[in-house]
């Protein structure tokens, strides 16, 4: 199960290694959103 905690950047799925995660594409966004 994918975990979604808003605001974006906290926890998206199991990906927590990047600063900001695009919750729509589940891809790391450089520089944040």
Swiss-Prot record:
Catalysed reaction, written as an equation: RNA(n) + a ribonucleoside 5'-triphosphate = RNA(n+1) + diphosphate
Keyword GTP-binding part of the UniProt annotation: no
Any Gene Ontology CC annotation: mitochondrion
Lineage: superkingdom: Eukaryota
Annotated GO MF terms: DNA-directed RNA polymerase activity
Known EC number: 2.7.7.6
Nucleotidyltransferase keyword on record: yes
Main location: plastid
Keywords, comma-separated and alphabetical: Chloroplast, DNA-directed RNA polymerase, Nucleotidyltransferase, Plastid, Transcription, Transferase
Record localization: Plastid, Chloroplast
Subunit and interaction comment: In plastids the minimal PEP RNA polymerase catalytic core is composed of four subunits: alpha, beta, beta', and beta''. When a (nuclear-encoded) sigma factor is associated with the core the holoenzyme is formed, which can initiate transcription.
Family the UniProt entry places it in: Belongs to the RNA polymerase beta' chain family. RpoC1 subfamily.
Job of this protein: DNA-dependent RNA polymerase catalyzes the transcription of DNA into RNA using the four ribonucleoside triphosphates as substrates.
Name by which UniProt lists this protein: DNA-directed RNA polymerase subunit beta'
Lineage summary: Eukaryota, Sar, Stramenopiles, Ochrophyta, Raphidophyceae
């Amino acid at each position: 199960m994918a975990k979604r905690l808003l605001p974006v950047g906290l926890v998206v799925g199991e990906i927590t290694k990047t600063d900001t995660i695009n919750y729509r594409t589940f891809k790391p966004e450089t520089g944040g959103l």
